[in-house]
Amino acid sequence: MTKTRILLSDSTDPWFNLAVEDTIFRSMPADQRVLFLWRNADTVVIGRAQNPWRECKTDRMEQDKVKLARRQTGGGAVFHDLGNTNFTFMAGKPEYDKEVSTKIVLAGLQKLGIHGVANGRNDLVLEDEQGIRKFSGSAYRETLDRGFHHGTLLLSADLNRLADYLNPDLKKLQAKGITSVKSRVINLNTVKADIEHQQVCEAIMQAYCEHYQQQVEPELISPQSFFDLPGFEQKFAQQSSWDWNFGQTPPFTHHMDERFSWGGVEVYLEVERGTIVQATIFSDMLDPYPMEQLALRLSGLTYNKTALEPCLAQLMQELPQYQLPLEEFQRWFIDQID
């Protein structure tokens, strides 16, 4: 008989939860099925092939201590807070079936008086006076012998904060990654005012056990106990690293231009794996030497202000006669990177 497990995370760290998900998925026997329920504190979660500089307001996230987490699956960028409940269904093949897991989630919600439906894409929706409204999005991953379906449920998320960290000015980024599809969304507390995370988890667990006709005791997952699982520590280190969350970004070009009192500049930065591989600066500045020097020095630097500010400071120190235009350029340039 297939062993059935239910895991509940008591951590709200997105890097921990995503590392748990991936470690369990990789290490579970192919004849096992797992339900994993979790939630994250303030986080922007991006798809595996997305560009965080395009999808997110990274400066605002840093200011507000909002984490960035790149998941293993595709799809778009989403904002998580404690008003979200996340689910992951894992199973070996041929049992793995995302339609079954979707039915289980909907059955759990029906126990709470919420009658959602699956639409033609990968969303769960409700219909109200404003039309069809999305309350859940999903993404999927499959290997040769197993698969998983994970998604998020909007219970009481602060929807106003979506605009704080997503949908930035595009700043002429020409990206090869996937741009998120923005959908109209709704919180489930508009249907059931007292809905909360534990209540939803219990309803989904009950629907899960009923579907498989098994009674399963949930296992509590916490950072204090989980680091002993083989491979987890390395996966957590990867999941929380800058190289994974930013460096895995598909190649892109950042084009920016501005006119200053001393002349105009047009900057092209070719970025791969979070590193500037080529910088080109055009300018009608009377003496273009400082811009030529800057272009040479930008190549090879990490694409963030922490790496770029010292480069400009060093150039100003070496070329004091150009300090005023370089200072003006620096203020504008660093703001564009953010």
From Swiss-Prot:
- The residues covered by the BPL/LPL catalytic domain are 29-216
| UniProt keywords, alphabetically | ATP-binding, Cytoplasm, Ligase, Nucleotide-binding
Recorded GO MF terms:
ATP binding; lipoate-protein ligase activity; lipoyltransferase activity
Annotated positions binding ATP: R71, G76, A77, V78, F79, K134
**Binding locations of (R)-lipoate:** K134
Q: What is its EC number?
A: 6.3.1.20
Q: Which GO terms describe its cellular component?
A: cytoplasm; cytosol
Name the domain of life. Bacteria
Q: Which Gene3D superfamilies match?
A: Bira Bifunctional Protein, Domain 2, CO dehydrogenase flavoprotein, C-terminal domain
Q: Which reaction does it catalyse?
A: L-lysyl-[lipoyl-carrier protein] + (R)-lipoate + ATP = N(6)-[(R)-lipoyl]-L-lysyl-[lipoyl-carrier protein] + AMP + diphosphate + H(+)
* Localisation per UniProt entry: Cytoplasm
Pathway per its UniProt entry is:
Protein modification; protein lipoylation via exogenous pathway; protein N(6)-(lipoyl)lysine from lipoate: step 1/2; Protein modification; protein lipoylation via exogenous pathway; protein N(6)-(lipoyl)lysine from lipoate: step 2/2
- What's a GO biological-process term for it? protein modification process
User: Would you identify the family this protein belongs to, as annotated?
Assistant: Belongs to the LplA family.
Describe, as the record does, how this protein assembles with itself and its partners: Monomer.
Instruction: Explain the purpose of this protein.
Output: Catalyzes both the ATP-dependent activation of exogenously supplied lipoate to lipoyl-AMP and the transfer of the activated lipoyl onto the lipoyl domains of lipoate-dependent enzymes.
Q: What else is known?
A: In the transfer reaction, the free carboxyl group of lipoic acid is attached via an amide linkage to the epsilon-amino group of a specific lysine residue of lipoyl domains of lipoate-dependent enzymes.
Cite the HAMAP family for this sequence: LplA
Q: What is this protein called?
A: Lipoate-protein ligase A
Which organism is the protein's source?
Vibrio cholerae serotype O1 (strain ATCC 39315 / El Tor Inaba N16961)
Top-down, what is the taxonomic lineage of the species of origin?
A: Bacteria, Pseudomonadati, Pseudomonadota, Gammaproteobacteria, Vibrionales
Q: Which gene encodes it?
A: lplA
